[in-house]
């Protein structure tokens, strides 16, 4: 079995987690108490969904997940929410005082006390797996817990489970919307360890997802629930091939192989189509070609950066529902002929496609329409560097005055860590620049010979 363990860290990680597990349960027909009437093989069984759920002898399905936060309020919502019976109480770990938006508290002082407990619980989940494939880690890098404890856990997972893949779903600060003043510090410090300790990171950013909700779903004032439900569709599409039997299945390690040309260049953009409200879907025929095109629209990207400003290195298209390979090939062929979508010249094919016959499921009473087919795209584009350069600029403005730095130093960090992390990110921006311009230099030489 190829199990995946999900680790949800901090408020963002947990709330995205809630949306994901709600959706998984609906997709597999698992009730909020963990019972699954449709499952005939009680206690174990080699069903595809066992990658994400473990089964008890009593036929209860328990998510292979842990939720961690340094303060109790968000986890208490899980403990009292609709799905309270789904999780084992030991899977929900909360501390007493929060990280106060401070990376150093999450990473050094307070995080340090809780991290062993987390690893212990993860070890229990891992022992329960026959062939652990890897970890899905959900966090945000703007806050204190997601960035600090998130980095700490990733570092420790690398030590304990060196060869296992780690996929990160990471909420990055948005250009305009900010939830805390020290976001740039936390993000830079945290990206420093994401660079080293995740194999693939999918960047999400609230502002981009707000815009998608407003534009495509006509939600005047989107809430985090609206945002998270959209994100959960993306994550569900990515993991569908692990949870259902499909025609063209895609493994977690396959993402890595197909999307990451160089170890450091592993920050991905994601998009999902069709994002459409029930009123509209009734009147539209959404063909494979149409949803494929809209997945490539800059406005569909779930992070604020424009793929037209960069080049694609690789792309993963995960289709689900009523889709046949012939249509996919045609749609991809059309995309390749478009001049607006540029690939780097050293990666001619650039597409990895997966198809899953399970139609997309929607949360009842949610915003998305029930559709026959959907596509989720994860792409590696040099334009992601825009996200980093934005954060770096803000970091530099504050750090030049050493503003707020004493809060971090007071928790046992050294100033050197700031500059080290910042240099690492500067190097990353440079890496992206070079990858995009890889063989452009070759062209200049040819022109020289023409004279």
From Swiss-Prot:
Cofactor: Mg(2+)
Keywords, alphabetical: Acetylation, Cytoplasm, Cytoskeleton, GTP-binding, Hydrolase, Magnesium, Metal-binding, Microtubule, Nucleotide-binding
SMART domains the record matches: Tubulin, Tubulin_C
InterPro entries listed in its UniProt record: Alpha_tubulin, Tub_FtsZ_C, Tubulin, Tubulin/FtsZ-like_C, Tubulin/FtsZ_2-layer-sand-dom, Tubulin/FtsZ_GTPase_sf, Tubulin_C, Tubulin_CS
Reactions that this protein is recorded to catalyse: GTP + H2O = GDP + phosphate + H(+)
Subcellular location: Cytoplasm, Cytoskeleton
Residue positions binding GTP: 11, 71, 144-145, 179, 206, 228
Identification of the protein by name: Tubulin alpha chain
Organism: Daucus carota
Designated gene of the protein: TBA
